[in-house]
Amino acid sequence: MATPAYMSITGTKQGLITAGAFTEDSVGNTYQEGHEDQVMVQGFNHEVIIPRDPQSGQPTGQRVHKPVVITKVFDKASPLLLAALTSGERLTKVEIQWYRTSAAGTQEHYYTTVLEDAIIVDIKDYMHNCQDPGNAHFTHLEDVHFTYRKITWTHEVSGTSGSDDWRSPVAG
């Protein structure tokens, strides 16, 4: 089973949008101590591509960052995220902390993804068919799509990092 990640979101209007999002009142029995001001990320998808000519394989344009898409359960932050979407609120920082099981058998924060100057461009709320027994373990979910100006990836344990900022040209 995959280990979930945890995300915090700070907006220019609402401040810490994820404050209290992972408390018992917000998520019920899935609450875990230590992540109270974050949302649990159940799914993640992100692509960065360089367009290429199908014949030659040569690049035909600049890098393209597609939206970061996370899947999360409905929680205290859900209405605030929808408000950020509908108002076009700029998110100064979106931080996703990735966890894994260490060699010692404990959970360790080993990787971080940070988005700067992000906005929410799409939210899809959904519920799987509750009459289908195969969906018994699903709850109410939402996919949140973020675009951003800058992204930074950091491997916390190994001490490596990389980033891309649309304001800075890529060095050739």
UniProtKB/Swiss-Prot annotation:
Its main location: secreted. The keyword Secreted applies. Pfam families: T6SS_HCP. One of its GO terms (cellular component) is extracellular region. It comes from the Bacteria. Keywords: Secreted. It is found in: Secreted. Belongs to the hcp1 family. This is Major exported protein. It comes from Pseudomonas aeruginosa (strain ATCC 15692 / DSM 22644 / CIP 104116 / JCM 14847 / LMG 12228 / 1C / PRS 101 / PAO1).
